[in-house]
Amino acid sequence: MSAVGQRGGSTLAAVMLLLVMGLMLLNAQHRQLDSALLLAADQQRYLKAYNQAASALSWGVAQSWPRNRLGVNGWWCQQTEELRACAKLSARAGIVLVRGDGAMSEGEPLRLYQLTKPDGTGGTFELSAEVGGWLDFCPEKREADCAD
């Protein structure tokens, strides 16, 4: 073969190499964006459940609770279409534990807790939140006291 017929072969190889490298970079970026999208969706579901639990907790503290329904052995719940709040007497004297539930797409609900003091003498009582009593974990010492 003559030298004239082989001109441009190395240029073609360089262009093909650049195209392959560009395709590999685009593929890697696509995978990275897919994982970032999944992470953003998970965060969105968590924040929705967290806000729902916080709203339920705030709503629950503002409710009147029947004195004869609350005990240390089990939760008594009130709910609306979107919110669910539960209360029980704490193992600590003079404390009512209020729980707000937020629905996750699968698995356990997200739960927030508030330590409160009961006010009132009739068949129901109002609750007043304890300063520093907001918790994202159940404060009871025994695990059975936190279970439904």
Where are the regions that the model predicts?
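N-terminal leader/signal peptides at the extreme start of proteins
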Residues: M1-R7
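Conserved functional hotspots that engage anionic ligands or polymers and/or phospholipid headgroups
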Residues: S10-A13, L17, N27-R31, A36-N51, ...
